């Protein structure tokens, strides 16, 4: 049986893993075995956190909108319901940006939301 030498392949694989682990602390960047484990774990974290980031940003936008609408004596849920009834389709990210940077237009959205809510209440009373 022929003698198989695979030093080149193993070295290339180790080099690739150690290159990915560059910047890690201690043995995690120097030894192949721990570097490989660290890279696998880092991949799991990044996969999870790409999904969590979407949740965190949505939570942040809702918090900002809630704080802005409560200054105008309306709750977040009523504000969003009023926008839906007024047929205004603006996503939470844009509402958050408007609340921070363009308060005048955000107040007009609050007003139209309140108007839609009062028209719903008037229809219920009839």
Swiss-Prot record:
Species, as recorded: Buchnera aphidicola subsp. Baizongia pistaciae (strain Bp)
Family affiliation: Belongs to the bacterial ribosomal protein bL20 family.
Upper lineage: Bacteria, Pseudomonadati, Pseudomonadota, Gammaproteobacteria, Enterobacterales
Gene3D superfamilies (alphabetical): 6.10.160.10, Ribosomal protein L20
Pfam annotation, one family: Ribosomal_L20
GO CC, alphabetical: ribonucleoprotein complex; ribosome
InterPro entries: Ribosomal_bL20, RIBOSOMAL_L20_CS, Ribosomal_protein_bL20_C
GO biological process: ribosomal large subunit assembly; translation
Protein name, as recorded: Large ribosomal subunit protein bL20
Molecular-function annotations in GO: rRNA binding; structural constituent of ribosome
Keywords: Ribonucleoprotein, Ribosomal protein, RNA-binding, rRNA-binding
Free-text function comment from the UniProt entry: Binds directly to 23S ribosomal RNA and is necessary for the in vitro assembly process of the 50S ribosomal subunit. It is not involved in the protein synthesizing functions of that subunit.
């Amino acid at each position: 049986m022929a003698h198989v030498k695979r030093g080149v392949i193993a070295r290339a694989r180790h080099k690739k893993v150690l290159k990915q682990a560059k910047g890690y602390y201690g043995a995690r960047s120097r030894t192949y075995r721990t570097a490989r484990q660290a890279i696998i774990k880092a991949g799991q974290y990044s996969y999870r956190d790409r999904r969590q980031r979407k949740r965190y940003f949505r939570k942040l936008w809702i918090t900002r909108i809630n704080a802005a609408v409560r200054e105008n004596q309306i709750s977040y849920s009523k504000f969003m319901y009023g926008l839906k009834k007024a047929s205004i389709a603006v996503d939470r990210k844009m509402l958050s940006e408007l609340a921070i940077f363009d308060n005048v237009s955000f107040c007009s959205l609050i007003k139209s939301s309140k108007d839609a809510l009062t028209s719903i209440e008037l229809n219920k009373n009839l």
